[in-house]
Amino acid sequence: MDRQIAKPSIREENERAILAAAEAEFAEQGFGGATMAAIAARAGVPKPNVYYYFPTKERLYRAVVERVLNEWLEAASSFDTSDDPAEALTSYISAKMDLARVMPLGSKIWASEIMRGAPAIQDFLDTTLTQWVRSRERVVRRWIAEGKLKPIEPRVLLYMIWATTQQYANAAHEIATLEHGELSDAAFERAKRQIIETIVGGVVAR
C-alpha cells in the first residue's frame, strides 16, 4: 500500500507564499524600502494575513534571512555523513552552487544584511552560525590529523567556498554581462565542476 504524502496545511502554504514574496521584495527594495503592503500584494494575500503570521516587518525579515542560512547549513550535511573529505567537500560545494542558482535572492539579502553589520541577526551569528562553524572546524582538523587534507586553516577553506559559490548569486548581473547572457545550465555545470576541481584538488592530500 502506497504511503500518502501529507499535503501542506493552509497555514504552511500561506507562510511559504509570504516568505517567498518577502524574499523578492527585500532583495529588490532592501529592508527600508520594502513594505508589508507590497509583500502582501506579491503573495496574493490580504495585508492583515501577513501581520497575522509575522506581526512586524522585522520579524518577517528575520524569518527570511534565517531561512536562507538554514538552507546553507543543511547543504553541509555531508560533513556529518561522510569520512571522505573529497566526497564531503564536493557535495557541499555542489549544493551551495545549486542554492546560488535557485535561491539567488536569498543570497543577495544575506549579503546586504552582513554589509549593514547584521543588525537583525547578530544573535543568530553569535550562536547558530558560530556553533556550526566550530563543528565543521573540528571535522576538517580531524581530516588533517588523519592525513586526508593538507594542513590548511579550516575557516579560510569555508570562507573560500562561501565567497566562490555566493558570487554566482550576488554578482549574477555582472556574470551575465561578461558572459553576454545568463549562464545556461550546461555552462553553470561546467563552472561548478571547475570550482570543485580547483578547491577540492587544492586541499585534499595526495
Language-model segments: which ranges?
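Amphipathic alpha-helical segments used for helix-helix packing
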Residues: R101-D123, A171-L178
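Helix-turn-helix
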Residues: E13, A17, E25-R59, A63
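Amphipathic alpha-helical linker/stalk segments
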Residues: R62-S91, R136-R141
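All-alpha amphipathic helical-bundle segments outside canonical DNA-binding/catalytic cores
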Residues: E87, D123-T128, I144-M160, R190
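Hydrophobic alpha-helical connector segments
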Residues: S77-K108, P154-I161, E189
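N-terminal intrinsically disordered/low-complexity leader segments
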Residues: M1-E13, A20
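C-terminal peripheral helix-coil segments that are non-catalytic and often amphipathic
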Residues: M1-R3, D98, V102, T130, ...
